[in-house]
């Protein structure tokens, strides 16, 4: 398979998990495309079947805060089309799964088969997702994902309870 992985590239658990997963999948013969604003800290300079696509956020005087989520959506769209990806695997519901949903909508006329898998890591559900400013978009992004995984049984239960995602099936590998 050809898989796009989006994660925070900085030091932290979710970036490490996403990068190690990508490396392991590449060793099994899959083609992995990391799509993020910087090379993940755990990703060596070169590995077979692994590619890095930088998201250029750009700086415009109109925007006080650069719209990373929109730039990410466009970059995901480009990489899917240019490299024939089969799925986008997002680590964190917002902004990554949100951006993937936008990219998927943009791809609908030419690539209606693209799928989005979202892995929930914790902070996106227990802190950010419960902030009233982000609650609705977090729930939306979870529900629009084609598949969901969580890093623990606790997080699986917390997501279902907190967001009331009755139609969601969340795999936690246990």
Report each predicted region and the residues it spans:
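Donor nucleotide-sugar binding/catalytic pocket of nucleotide-sugar-dependent glycosyltransferases
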Residues: 56, 118, 138-174
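N-terminal strand-loop element at the rim of the active site
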Residues: 7, 11, 23-68
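Extreme N-terminal starter segment of soluble prokaryotic enzymes
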Residues: 1-3
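Alpha-helix capping/helix-boundary segments
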Residues: 40, 95, 154-156
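An amphipathic, basic-hydrophobic alpha-helix
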Residues: 61-88, 97-98, 102, 132-136, ...
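Nucleotide-sugar donor phosphate/pyrophosphate-binding loop at the beta->alpha transition
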Residues: 107-117, 123-141, 157
